[in-house]
Amino acid sequence: MINLIGTYECKVDAKGRLMVPSALKKQLAPMMQDGFVIKRAVFQNCLELYPMEEWNVLMKRMNGLNRFKKKNNDFIRRFTAGVKTVEVDTNGRLLIPKDLVGFAGIEKEIVLSSAINIVEIWDKDKYEQTLEDSSDDFADLAEEVMGNDDFDGVS
């Protein structure tokens, strides 16, 4: 498992291409050859970029779901809707498919935000609004999620 670090602001051109920031590209370098999967996020109007190795781990888990249960089948269909494979080209650009640009409401300025083992791709205004909207709740959320005894030595 990888641990990506950083938040990067960049621009998307009219074709949906973004130049991957060099600091992020260095972190992703070991995974470049295998490519990436890009998809709609489940909880926000942003996109998620999975290194192929991380995607395969997730798919192995999803393959364990019983497809004869309607909820599982519905979840798989909706989770994988619009999923695309993408690569960083020789110029260091990543092409975001048009349908996903539309889903995320991406205009021109975007934010690439590390989320442990994936990268979230946000329209800059939506990202800032999301952080602003949830800032009051973050202390309570942090306590609820991380404030138990399950994490020995984590502070």
From Swiss-Prot:
> Where does the record place it?
Cytoplasm, Nucleoid
Protein name per its UniProtKB record: Transcriptional regulator MraZ
Q: Name one Pfam family in it.
A: MraZ
Metal-binding keyword on record? no
For the biological process aspect of GO, one term held by this record is: negative regulation of DNA-templated transcription initiation
Q: Which GO terms describe its molecular function?
A: DNA-binding transcription factor activity; transcription cis-regulatory region binding
Q: Where is the SpoVT-AbrB domain?
A: 7-54, 83-126
Q: What is its main location?
A: cytoplasm
Output the PANTHER family linked to this UniProt entry: TRANSCRIPTIONAL REGULATOR MRAZ
Q: Name one GO cellular component term.
A: nucleoid
Keyword list, A-Z? Cytoplasm, DNA-binding, Repeat, Transcription, Transcription regulation
Q: Which family does it belong to?
A: Belongs to the MraZ family.
Native source species: Christiangramia forsetii (strain DSM 17595 / CGMCC 1.15422 / KT0803)
What superkingdom does the record give?
Bacteria
**Complexes and interactors:** Forms oligomers.
Task: Give the InterPro entries listed for this entry.
Answer: MraZ, MraZ_C, MraZ_dom, MraZ_N, MraZ_sf, SpoVT-AbrB_dom, SpoVT-AbrB_sf
